[in-house]
Amino acid sequence: MASVEYLIKQFLTPDKKNLDLSNQNIGDKGAITLSKSKSIKRIKKLMLPNNNISDEGIIAIVNSENFKNLTDLDIYGNVISDDGVKAIAESTYISNLKKLSLYGNLVEDDGAIAIAESKILSKLKHLYITSNRIRREGIEALKNAKCRTRLCHLHVDDLEDFFYEEDQDYDDADLINSWEELKARNAEKGESED
């Protein structure tokens, strides 16, 4: 992997407002280096898909004053979980964010709820959060946020796509919990033990 500073020089647009580091595998170390770079203070659009960035890396980015002008953050296909998304939802440095792509990360309900309830992300209009681990509670929180606030373009997985139901009347009488219970059941059925 090339150094992050070299990649910035190669891929930062001449107006210094857009940086596309897609598929560069910069990881957390590279994300931390990026967050400290003096070259990106005017950046508005940051594209970091498929870079193996986890919570540590995204937390460094969203807590950097260098990203105070950021309006578009594309971090799909990384390994960002709820902690990273909560940092996004709580960071005052990225309060100008209008578009956020979290497609294909490790976000669960808590992360989705953090975005839905965020007071800081008041300008967010486009959210791409499909192909994560978000279930009913998170999806409903996001859909409710869309109805009452700013999310004009929300892309989440459909609830109908999930085929899970908690069966409250599940009869576990057939479950065997110990070796002794198995032997006793076999004896009741007249089956012999070898």
Show where each model-derived region lies.
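Short, solvent-exposed loop/turn at the beta-strand->alpha-helix junction
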Residues: 2-4, 24-32, 52-59, 79-86, ...
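C-terminal capping region of solenoid repeat domains
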Residues: 6, 16, 125-126, 133-194
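N-terminal segments that cap or nucleate solenoid repeat domains
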Residues: 1-46
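Inter-repeat linker/turn residues at the boundaries of leucine-rich repeats
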Residues: 14, 38-41, 65-68, 92-95, ...
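Alpha-helical adaptor scaffolds
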Residues: 49, 56-66, 72-94, 101
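Conserved hydrophobic beta-strand positions in leucine-rich repeat
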Residues: 17-21, 44-48, 70-75, 97-102, ...
